[in-house]
Amino acid sequence: MDVNTERSVFYISDGTAITAEVLGHAVMSQFPVATHGVTLPFVETVQRAQAVKAQINALYQQSGLRPLVFISIVTPVIRDIILQSDGFCQDIVQSLVGPLQQELGLLPAPVANRTHGLTAGNLSKYDARIAAIDYTLAHDDGISLRGLEDAQVILLGVSRCGKTPTSLYLAMQFGIRAANYPFIADDMDNLKLPAALKPFQHKLFGLTIEPERLAAIRQERAENTRYASLRQCRLEVGEVEALFRTQQIRYLNSTNYSVEEIATKILDIMSLTRRMY
């Protein structure tokens, strides 16, 4: 098969389809093939399932290539309709349920939307995640330095090095209360750790970035300005990294990492307990 030939990939669920997407993407990332993804959540009725089956079959007829179909469907009748399509179907949950049933000696009690839905059993975890998101938004970009005793991590770094997206990902994905504080150009003449942060040194974590990458990012926001110049970026990165070393603040170069990787590395380095939702 030509790796440049685009394959259609379906992620189908009678719930949010998050499980199908995550596991499907993980599997597809192992293959050097171009894909076009179609995510179909809440396929909960026979009529909808029949329409999805027809969509898969039509694509197969048009392209001559079987669409790749990852499903996470609890309802048997809905699942069977999709499995009868012309797609190459992978039931990513049921393939694990059988062996686990044998090991546990228990029959599964499947319930739609249990994984990512709101139930009595996970309500407290959901509330904790919303509280973490609220906290992170209120402590983004140095907006407030109050309540830092409640932070689980405080990210530091120059402007546009990835502090805000990483903080939000930590809050939304793991329920981590993350504050972040920026060092700006005006700080560089006499860069030091703000007094409000010193009592929480054990919570501080630095993000840095290659100056060339930083300049490219800033050029998109403020083209041909001192703020976006390579010289200014080199100055700021150098000064901030020196501060991290002087203050013995652990830090990570974010240049070649995704937000997901940065957040996970922070959890590991800071020994923070992850809470999956």
UniProtKB/Swiss-Prot annotation:
The keyword Nucleotide-binding applies. Pfam families: Kinase-PPPase. GO terms for molecular function: ADP binding; ATP binding; phosphotransferase activity, phosphate group as acceptor; protein serine/threonine kinase activity. It catalyses: [pyruvate, water dikinase] + ADP = [pyruvate, water dikinase]-phosphate + AMP + H(+); [pyruvate, water dikinase]-phosphate + phosphate + H(+) = [pyruvate, water dikinase] + diphosphate. The keyword Transmembrane helix does not apply. InterPro entries: Kinase-pyrophosphorylase, PSRP. It comes from the Bacteria. Its EC number is 2.7.11.33, 2.7.4.28. Keywords: Kinase, Nucleotide-binding, Serine/threonine-protein kinase, Transferase. ADP binds at G157, V158, S159, R160, C161, G162, K163, T164. Belongs to the pyruvate, phosphate/water dikinase regulatory protein family. PSRP subfamily. Bifunctional serine/threonine kinase and phosphorylase involved in the regulation of the phosphoenolpyruvate synthase (PEPS) by catalyzing its phosphorylation/dephosphorylation. This is Putative phosphoenolpyruvate synthase regulatory protein. The lineage of its organism: Bacteria, Pseudomonadati, Pseudomonadota, Gammaproteobacteria, Enterobacterales.
